[in-house]
């Protein structure tokens, strides 16, 4: 790594943050509009946490879509 990044600083997120981001993306993909109770059980999260994740993921998707649209 020193060969590629020697003298430069960079941010490497903790493993927990990466796992959380992957989990959140998976929850968003599995969501079908009617399966919140199933997601609560599967991921052992509260209803409010599931809805917060869905809200955040929806916002991320919109931003990605807008970026794609702007570069086309």
Swiss-Prot record:
DNA-binding annotation, residue ranges on this chain: 35-55
Gene3D superfamilies reported in the protein's UniProt record: Homeodomain-like
SUPFAM superfamilies: Homeodomain-like (SSF46689)
Keyword set, alphabetical order: DNA-binding, Transcription, Transcription regulation
Keyword Transcription assigned: yes
UniProt key word Metal-binding: no
Transmembrane annotation, as ranges: none
Top-level taxon: Bacteria
GO molecular function, one term: DNA binding
Protein family per UniProt: Belongs to the c/mor transcriptional regulatory family.
Function: Required for transcription of the phage late genes.
Name the record gives this protein: Mu-like prophage FluMu protein C
Lineage per the UniProt record: Bacteria, Pseudomonadati, Pseudomonadota, Gammaproteobacteria, Pasteurellales
């Amino acid at each position: 790594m020193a060969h590629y990044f020697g003298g430069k600083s960079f941010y490497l997120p903790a493993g927990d943050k990466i796992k959380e981001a992957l989990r959140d993306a998976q929850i968003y993909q599995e969501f079908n509009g009617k399966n919140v109770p199933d997601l609560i059980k599967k991921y052992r999260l509260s209803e409010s946490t599931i809805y917060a994740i869905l809200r955040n993921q929806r916002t991320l998707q919109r931003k990605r879509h807008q970026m794609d649209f702007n570069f086309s």
